[in-house]
Amino acid sequence: MEENYKATSRNGHELKDMYNPETNTLDIRSNGLYPSNVLSNLCSNGFRFDGMICESMEGFLQSLKRKELDKQRQICSMKGGNARKMSVTSWQTDQIVWWKGQAIDRQSEEYQQLIRSAYLAMFEQSERFRTALMQTRGMFLTHNSGESDTY
């Protein structure tokens, strides 16, 4: 059954309004009101990328931390919250991630292009993601969660 992404609460918790009208900024958060929640990597905006079925952007991103193709496929097929639980930190020391057996420098243009291509695939294939993104036209989009250290 499809979750109601325009709801104001989920699992007994109120979703938060992540829009700041003073700065015209929307903070993308899974616990935010629509469209913030649908733009989150944790949202189940399924797409197919490079022959892999990805149930969420989080699944794709977490899969990059694993060298083994079978493990990547498994993580790609997970929805956001479950995929996030598969996170590992071993890649951080040498800043190498993996895609389909190929090592990629996390700080490289090749990595940036891979991420752009995955987001483009999700945009093209997920009407819900596209519609939510179009709702933010003219807004500044941020993600003020996580670590500030890019390494």
Question: What is the meaning of each model-derived region?
Answer:
Residues 1-151:
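Charged, low-complexity intrinsically disordered segments
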